[in-house]
UniProtKB/Swiss-Prot annotation:
Its main location: host cell. It is found in: Host nucleus. Tyrosine phosphorylated. Functions as an E3 ubiquitin ligase and plays a role in the inhibition of innate immunity by preventing IFN-mediated signaling. Induces the ubiquitination and degradation of host STAT1, STAT2 and IRF9, resulting in the blockade of ISGF3 nuclear translocation. This is E3 ubiquitin ligase ICP22.
Amino acid sequence: MADIPPDPPALDTTPANHAPPSPLPGSRKRRRPVLPSSSESEGKPDIESESSSTESSEDEVGDLRGGRRRPPRELGGRYFLDLSAESTTGTESEGTGPSDDDDDDASDGWLVDTPPRKSKRPRINLRLTSSPDRRAGVVFPEVWRSDRPIRAAQPQAPAQSSGDRAHAPRRSARQAQMRSGAAWTLDLHYIRQCVNQ
């Protein structure tokens, strides 16, 4: 057996001078530029604060130009881009022509889905009239009626095939004539045919 030392250096729990843990890859914090006090500004300029301020402004410009945006806030189930957090510099907003913000939003995938507009169907107002008006030709004009006189005393003929559309207006007019004694009847099949023509 190998001899194990009683206090190996690997088990030493005293903290050594370690650097603080590095931040996670996505959570890089920007340093604020240090404002020089009045006594320091008279003497020499603060070189470190100038370099840190240029780094942070370059990071912001790089983030905006690279197409990266901050993730949207979620309020009540809807997503909103936090546009107040984004700042544009004077060089970007000067005379660059039309902005491509719409294209950037579409490529980033942060577009808010808007419901597609429903196309409105044309509204058709039908005037439904009682049977005396139907006989007078308000709903069924005289053009659609048959030329030969309608015989009301004849019993109704057996129903014709639905494929024969040439006789449909005659049949409807005949049925309207036969039902003229009824208080108020509708021939929905004929009305549909007239509307669809």
